[in-house]
């Protein structure tokens, strides 16, 4: 009996240790001018790429107060799912207020405010990686925010890669205000997409949802699920 009790206790300890490791989420902090190691709100990093790299296996990046980006932003690759949250993210590039996902893990924005320090348009380009706008996302009340499941232009790929017409996209919207949500691309082309765009709307306000592309192009398959929110056109 003692032997079995010992085995059970060892198994229980292993399970508890595994659960503890699973529950310990990696959190990194970042803001304008940060000079710390990112381990706390009082010691934030000053660079978003460095912050995301620290949670590449999965975790959360917390903006403390404000983070300003003067260039179009491209995430580093991250195997795990990441959450970008807190504070305010300010686009100041003007002509190229863009955020490109790096994948392959999902990127989720939640409880965050986006503002324009220059320009009046922003684009979130998923590049076929999962993109989620969770609860508490505030987008600029003036101007236009676009969410694109694939690329800006199908034939103008920002990565060293061939254009992808057979990939699936995954977008979920729970909050925020958007001028357009597009399953595959924004720019004009006459390509036919053979993948499936998956767009789920659980909240927020969207002027138009496009299953394929905003300007031209066609898709064989798209799945648009509207559970809640205000979608004016599909």
Task: Label the model's feature ranges.
Residues 1-6:
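Positively charged n-region of N-terminal signal peptides that target proteins for export
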Residues 10-11, 21:
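Cleavable N-terminal signal peptides
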Residues 18-26:
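Sec-dependent signal peptide cleavage junction
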Residues 30-31, 64, 85, 182, ...:
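Residue-level detector of conserved, well-ordered beta-strand and adjacent loop positions
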Residues 31-64:
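Acidic Gly/Asp/Thr-rich repetitive segments characteristic of extracellular carbohydrate-active
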Residues 56-57, 77-83, 98-182, 186-208, ...:
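Surface-exposed loop/turn motifs in large extracellular/passenger domains
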Residues 59-82, 86-97, 119:
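N-terminal extracellular ligand-recognition/capping segment immediately after the signal peptide
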């Amino acid at each position: 009996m003692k032997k079995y009790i010992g085995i059970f206790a060892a198994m229980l300890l292993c399970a508890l240790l595994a659960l503890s490791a699973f529950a310990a989420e990696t959190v990194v902090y970042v803001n304008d001018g940060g000079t710390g190691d990112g381990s706390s709100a009082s010691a934030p990093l000053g660079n978003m790429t460095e912050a995301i790299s620290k949670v590449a296996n999965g975790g959360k990046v917390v903006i403390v107060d404000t983070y300003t980006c003067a260039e179009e932003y491209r995430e580093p690759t991250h195997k795990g799912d990441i959450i970008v949250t807190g504070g305010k993210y300010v686009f100041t590039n003007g002509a190229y207020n863009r955020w490109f996902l790096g994948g392959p893990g999902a990127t989720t924005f939640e409880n965050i405010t986006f503002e324009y320090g220059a320009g009046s348009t922003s684009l979130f380009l998923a590049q076929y990686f999962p993109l989620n706008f969770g609860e508490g996302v505030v987008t600029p009340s003036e101007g236009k925010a676009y969410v694109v499941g694939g690329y800006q232009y199908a034939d103008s790929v920002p990565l060293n890669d061939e254009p992808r017409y057979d990939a699936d996209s995954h977008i979920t919207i729970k909050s925020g205000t958007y001028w357009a949500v597009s399953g595959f691309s924004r720019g004009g082309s006459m390509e036919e997409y053979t993948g499936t765009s998956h767009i789920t709307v659980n909240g927020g306000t969207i002027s138009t949802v496009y299953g394929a592309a905003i300007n031209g192009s066609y898709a064989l398959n798209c799945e648009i699920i509207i559970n809640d929110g205000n979608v004016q056109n599909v």
